Regions:
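Flexible, active-site-adjacent loop/turn segments at secondary-structure boundaries
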Residues: 39-40, 49, 77, 122, ...
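Alpha-helix termini
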Residues: 53, 87-91, 146
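Conserved beta-strand/loop positions that form the S-adenosyl-L-methionine
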Residues: 73-75
Length: 202
């Protein structure tokens, strides 16, 4: 299981100008794969290829965040939040209530020497205030549910960015959400993107 990282990862990292992060993301993929044997991080039958695809999908969110602070709701195995931090973001919060998943996230932060990203074991509905610039999430809940929970806790020029399939995006209200196609689509062979919502503009 210690084969070279797939060419698709290399292409993705070149596209977002982060080719130097290939080694770390390969290590991360292997950690997810190994821990998943005993901890339910991702789908039980996930292959290493599946995990690399999650990483590639997450990596293409990075250009929309850069150095803005973020909170990843339902971080789970670290998609997309931990990937964003490995790529170089210095101000993140991984929101994950489950003990085993939170332990995995803390292990990875320590392993990769990421000091300014924290793990918070809470649910979104139990937060008093969201201070980060961007709320991100992947496969946590329906966009409308996340929107209704988060909007009460946000103020100022903040935004929500959710990783979705094109089919998910079609179902959402275009007056609320802006759909941004992901550059990962052509690499993964499926149409994915991001739903963007800015509460201050409503």
């Amino acid at each position: 299981m210690h084969a070279e990282a797939p060419e698709s990862l290399k292409v993705s990292l070149e596209e977002i100008s982060k080719p130097e992060k290939e080694k770390e993301l390969k290590e991360f993929a292997l950690k997810v794969f190994d821990w998943n044997k005993t901890t339910n991080l991702v789908s039980k039958n996930s292959t290493l290829e599946n995990i690399y695809n999650h990483i590639i999908d997450s990596a293409h969110l990075y250009p929309y965040i850069q150095d803005n602070s973020y909170i990843d709701v339902g971080s789970g195995a670290g998609f997309p939040g931990l990937v964003i931090s490995i790529l170089g973001n210095k101000d993140g919060c991984l929101l994950e209530p489950a003990n085993k998943k939170a332990s995995f996230l803390r292990h990875c932060l320590a392993h990769f020497g990421i000091q300014n990203t924290k793990v918070l074991q809470k649910r979104l509905e139990h937060l008093d205030l969201i201070k980060e610039d961007v709320l991100i999430s992947r496969a946590f809940a329906e966009p409308k549910k996340i929107q209704s929970l988060a909007i009460k806790k946000m103020s100022g020029d903040q935004k929500i960015l959710l990783m979705v399939s094109e089919q998910q995006a079609i179902r959402e209200d275009k007056n609320d959400w802006k759909y941004i196609p992901s550059a990962a689509s052509k690499i993964l062979g499926k149409k994915t993107g991001f739903l963007e919502f800015n509460p201050s503009k409503k």
